[in-house]
Amino acid sequence: MTLESYAGDVHTVPQSENSMEERGGGELFVPPLNFAMVDNGIFRSGFPEPVSFSFLQSLRLKSIIYLCPEAYPEVNREFAKSNGIQVFQFGIERCKEPFVNIPDEVIREALQVLLDTENHPVLIHCKSGKHRTGCLVGCVRKIQRWCLSSIFDEYQRFAAAKARISDQRFMELFDISNLKHTPLSFSCSKRYTNTIDY
């Protein structure tokens, strides 16, 4: 089985036994843990291991948003450098405590990078691709005017049994009023609107 993602929806697709083996030049394409497409040019995942580098190359990434405070491993830095990928690090501490707040200002800085289409295609990741990544994606969804129940559903699809009330509260209370409200050029609704002739 493999997972295909379309704007946050995860679908299971049956595969033949050999379908993960050779693609094109005989390389193995293995997506990182919790990989999904958020929107056109925006992807999310857990920490990319070297086995996923060929897959990531196929995305032709321009940028990576890394949401952990730990130094980026040398092998990942070399991969980014050799592929012309700029890495933006926003160190958000891993937190399991229920009343510890996610740093609002760090999420805002990460959003500025994420919303700049010059940085697309971009991969957002933390260690597991659940909590920190889920909060940043949830804030993007608020900007895209998703309702809270849909934002929480998407968050819970990735966090599963480890969903945190504190993360959901952060997304609910995150104030988007002072963010630049230009149409998001990567959003599906804008893309379809531009193709209609009146």
UniProtKB/Swiss-Prot annotation:
The record marks R132 as: Transition state stabilizer. Keywords: Hydrolase, Plant defense. Residues 1-23 are annotated as: Disordered. It catalyses: 5-diphospho-1D-myo-inositol 1,2,3,4,6-pentakisphosphate + H2O = 1D-myo-inositol hexakisphosphate + phosphate + H(+); 1,5-bis(diphospho)-1D-myo-inositol 2,3,4,6-tetrakisphosphate + H2O = 1-diphospho-1D-myo-inositol 2,3,4,5,6-pentakisphosphate + phosphate + 2 H(+); 3,5-bis(diphospho)-1D-myo-inositol 1,2,4,6-tetrakisphosphate + H2O = 3-diphospho-1D-myo-inositol 1,2,4,5,6-pentakisphosphate + phosphate + 2 H(+); 6-diphospho-1D-myo-inositol pentakisphosphate + H2O = 1D-myo-inositol hexakisphosphate + phosphate + H(+). The keyword Ion transport does not apply. Residues 34-188 form the Tyrosine-protein phosphatase domain. The active site is at C126. Its EC number is 3.6.1.52. It is an enzyme of class 3 (hydrolase). PROSITE patterns: TYR_PHOSPHATASE_1, TYR_PHOSPHATASE_2, TYR_PHOSPHATASE_DUAL. 1D-myo-inositol hexakisphosphate binds at N101, I102. Plants overexpressing DSP4 exhibit increased sensitivity to infection by the bacterial pathogen Pseudomonas syringae pv tomato strain DC3000. Belongs to the protein-tyrosine phosphatase family. Atypical dual-specificity phosphatase Siw14-like subfamily. This is Inositol diphosphatase DSP4.
